Design a protein with these regions (language model features):
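Extended, charge-rich alpha-helical interface modules
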Residues: 2-250
Length: 250
């Protein structure tokens, strides 16, 4: 196998069977160099798997996109941290979708959600009459909350292609019915990284819409892709960057 070709975006042999790449997490292809981390085989295989998925969906891949983090050295947040972030996202999503301010405050009080919001989220929560644009922007946080509920094992189905909005009623009903969102352990690092790599490449494909090199985008909702990418990036990089600092533009 030509490892250099893989790193530069070439294809390896077709991946057979499942999607577990943990066995390759310690097969280092390129050693660390200063602040640049090592590249391991699981990162390469994960990228290849994602690119094959995108091509099957009729999307043109961008071979210039790098690999994402691998399992080696990965530090996921605790279930409690993910549960807190999920609850905050669901509440701002609900306010963005139009529930009354008094109902927002009741939910925060009942779930003890004080202090869970980022600075930008708190500003939105405190604004009694936010603009239509603000409401629309924060209403999409339902998608990020759904993604984290999947990571917390409350939803079994794979995330799949970011083509349609999540079932926000089911999301909120599930959250209200479960007092302890952190009652399960997080999904395995391999599974989270698989979805993170897919979300990254779907979102980058969505960002190419309207540019000279990409005129159409088959069956992808750009906003769903963005929120899913944001949530999974936070899961895999939470100890290096705050939620509000993640832009999802690259």
């Amino acid at each position: 196998m030509n490892h250099l070709r893989l790193i530069q975006g070439g294809a390896a042999e077709p991946i057979e069977g499942g999607r577990s790449f943990s066995h390759a997490a310690r097969q280092e292809l390129v050693p660390a160099n200063g602040d640049v981390p090592a590249v391991c085989m699981d990162q390469i295989l994960r990228r290849q798997f994602s690119e094959e998925r995108l091509q099957a969906d009729g999307l043109r891949i961008d071979p210039r996109l790098p690999v994402i983090s691998g399992e080696t050295g990965l530090r996921l947040p605790t279930s409690g941290e993910v549960a807190d972030r999920t609850l905050a996202l669901a509440i701002v999503g609900a306010k963005g979708s139009g529930i009354p301010q008094i109902e927002v405050e009741r939910i925060i009080d009942e779930r003890g959600a004080y202090g869970l919001f980022t600075p930008r989220e708190q500003d939105f929560i405190d604004e009694v009459l936010p603009s239509v644009e603000e409401r629309d922007r924060f209403s999409w946080r339902y998608e990020a909350a759904w993604t984290l509920m999947w990571a917390l094992r409350h939803f079994d189905a794979p995330l799949g292609r970011p083509a349609t909005r999540c079932d926000s009623d089911r999301l909120m009903d599930t959250i209200f019915d479960i007092p302890d969102l952190a009652r399960h352990r997080l999904r395995a690092p391999n599974d989270i990284l698989n979805e993170a790599d897919l979300a990254y490449r779907y979102h980058m494909a969505a960002l190419r819409v309207g540019r000279a090199d990409e005129a159409t985008l088959p069956a992808i909702d750009p906003e769903v892709a963005r929120e899913r990418h944001h949530a999974l990036s936070w899961l895999t990089c939470h100890d290096a960057i705050e939620w509000d600092e993640l832009t999802g533009d690259a």
